[in-house]
C-alpha cells in the first residue's frame, strides 16, 4: 500500500481522534529520492503516477475484494483527495476531500481537506462547471479559518483573490486579520513559512493605500524590506511599493511640518495683533485720562 504510517488507534481514541505527536529538536533537512518502482514505472509522467495512486486508494476504500479494503481509513480518504489533486483531477479530489472532512478525526487533516476543497473549486476545471464556484470556495476558506483560526493560509487566499478581483475593502480586511497570526509552531501538516514570513505582509502592503491606511502599508512594506525573507524575483516590486509609501510618508511629514510652521506664524501674528490692540487700548486710556485732567483743570480755573 501507499501513504501508510504507524498508528495506535487505542491511544488516538484517548486524544479525541488526534495523532500523538512528538518532535525532534534542531534543524534538519530530509533528502528525498524518488527512485522506487512507482517512479520507475511512470518516469516523468507525474500526473499519471498520482492518478494511479488515487485508483489504488479508491479501491482500498470501495472494493470489498481488495486485500487492503478499509472503507473507514481516514488516511486513505485524505490521500485519495491528495492524489487526485496532484493528478489534476480536481472534481474527484473535491469529492474525496469532502469525505475526509466529514469523517472527522485528526483536526489538521480535516482542516486541510476543507482548505483544499476551496482550491479545487478555484481550478479551471471546476470553475467551468460551477457557476457559483467562488461563493462556494469562499465558504470553504472561511470554514477552514473557523476550524483553525491560527492557520493563516485561508486568509492569504481570500486576501489575494479579492485583491485580484478588485475588492480592496475585503482584501484589506483579510490581509490585516492574517498578518498578525504567528507561525503555528505546534502544527505539522503542510506548513508554509512564506505565508507567515512575507506573503500576507505583501498583500497588506498592496492594498492598504487603497483604503487610505498609508501608515499600516508603510509598516508592512518596511518590515518586508527590513527582514528580506521574500524570493529575489519579488524584490523590485516590493521595493517599488516601499518607495511609494516612503515618499508618501515623507510628503506627509513635510506637510505636517509646514502646517506646524504656518500655525506658529498664525499664532505669532495673532499674538502681535493682540499686543498691538492692547497697546492701542492703553494709549486710548491714557489719552482719555489726559483729556479728563485738562477738563478738570479748566473747570477749576473758571471758578
Region locations from a protein language model:
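"A position-specific structural signal for the A-helix of alpha-solenoid helical repeats
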Residues: 79, 116, 157, 164, ...
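Catalytic-site signature of metal-activated, phosphate-bearing donor transferases
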Residues: 1-92, 248
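Start-of-helix register in tetratricopeptide repeats
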Residues: 75, 108-112, 153, 194, ...
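Short coil turns that delineate tetratricopeptide repeat
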Residues: 71, 105-108, 149, 183, ...
Amino acid at each position: 500500500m501507499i501513504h501508510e504510517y504507524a498508528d495506535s488507534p487505542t491511544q488516538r481514541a484517548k486524544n479525541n481522534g488526534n495523532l500523538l505527536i512528538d518532535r525532534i529538536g534542531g534543524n534538519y533537512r530530509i533528502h528525498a529520492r524518488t527512485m522506487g518502482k512507482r517512479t520507475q514505472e511512470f518516469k516523468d509522467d507525474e500526473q499519471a503516477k498520482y492518478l494511479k495512486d488515487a485508483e489504488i486508494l479508491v479501491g482500498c476504500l470501495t472494493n470489498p475484494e481488495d486485500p487492503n479494503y478499509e472503507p473507514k481509513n481516514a488516511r486513505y480518504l485524505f490521500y485519495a483527495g491528495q492524489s487526485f489533486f496532484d493528478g489534476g483531477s480536481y472534481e474527484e479530489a473535491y469529492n474525496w476531500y469532502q469525505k475526509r472532512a466529514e469523517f472527522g478525526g485528526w483536526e489538521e487533516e480535516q482542516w486541510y481537506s476543507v482548505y483544499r476543497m476551496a482550491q479545487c473549486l478555484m481550478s479551471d476545471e471546476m470553475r467551468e462547471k460551477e457557476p457559483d464556484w467562488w461563493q462556494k470556495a469562499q465558504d470553504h476558506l472561511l470554514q477552514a479559518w473557523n476550524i483553525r483560526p491560527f492557520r493563516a493560509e485561508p486568509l492569504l487566499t481570500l486576501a489575494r483573490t479579492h485583491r485580484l478581483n478588485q475588492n480592496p475593502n475585503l482584501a484589506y480586511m483579510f490581509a490585516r486579520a492574517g498578518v498578525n497570526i504567528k507561525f503555528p509552531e505546534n502544527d505539522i501538516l503542510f506548513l508554509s513559512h512564506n505565508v507567515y514570513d512575507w506573503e500576507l505582509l505583501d498583500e497588506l502592503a498592496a492594498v492598504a493605500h487603497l483604503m487610505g491606511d498609508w501608515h499600516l502599508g508603510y509598516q508592512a512594506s518596511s518590515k518586508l524590506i527590513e527582514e528580506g525573507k521574500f524570493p529575489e524575483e519579488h524584490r523590485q516590486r516590493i521595493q517599488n511599493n516601499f518607495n511609494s509609501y516612503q515618499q508618501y510618508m515623507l510628503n506627509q511629514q513635510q506637510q505636517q511640518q509646514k502646517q506646524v510652521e504656518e500655525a506658529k506664524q498664525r499664532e505669532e501674528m495673532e499674538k502681535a495683533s493682540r499686543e498691538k490692540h492692547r497697546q492701542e487700548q492703553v494709549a486710548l486710556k491714557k489719552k482719555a485720562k489726559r483729556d479728563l485732567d485738562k477738563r478738570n483743570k479748566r473747570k477749576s480755573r473758571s471758578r
